[in-house]
């Protein structure tokens, strides 16, 4: 159980995740809810990407510790970046998942499907990849996935300024959106980790203050 929110700005992206996990049994009941340990997050930098997932912890493990994503040319953006994600990134992701034995075992689902929603940022552009490996981007630049996504997405739209927010504003509303989700969704909870990806590229920087982690990546 997870909530991840993201904001697409002009030349930057902000991704923010909670730290709560739970096991769901066959009846749909949630078993003991726990919090990820120190140094762990549902989002991580992998090469030039920020990668996160809502669904199975196994998907997060593979994304962060096994998957070697293909690197797009540094100047790739727009439709050419879309094509790269479609033709290069997603096939590599699917191959990695299948090699690791991760996929859908639910009756009626195609073998190609898996059980998590994946969110990524590359070149300060956000993509959300569904269980069937299709991807989408939001025209307004606001994203939320996971068990508390409805609460978080509503909060993002209410809190967002009329114009595209600057990075500091985007980080603030992302944290507030997660806090709103945590109030109404038992599967969402602190500490919250915030990641920033900006263009032009800057050297990675990771600072921790209280419950927030900030990363700047190429």
Predicted feature residues:
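Long, charge-patterned amphipathic alpha-helical coiled-coil/hairpin "stalk" segments used as oligomerization
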Residues: 111-145
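Catalytic phosphate/metal-binding cores of nucleic-acid and nucleotide-processing enzymes, i.e., regions
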Residues: 109-125, 159-176, 204-218
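Conserved short S/T/G-enriched processing/targeting/catalytic segments and their helical context
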Residues: 1-105, 110, 136-172, 184-205
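Low-complexity, intrinsically disordered Gly/Pro/Thr-rich segments
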Residues: 176-182
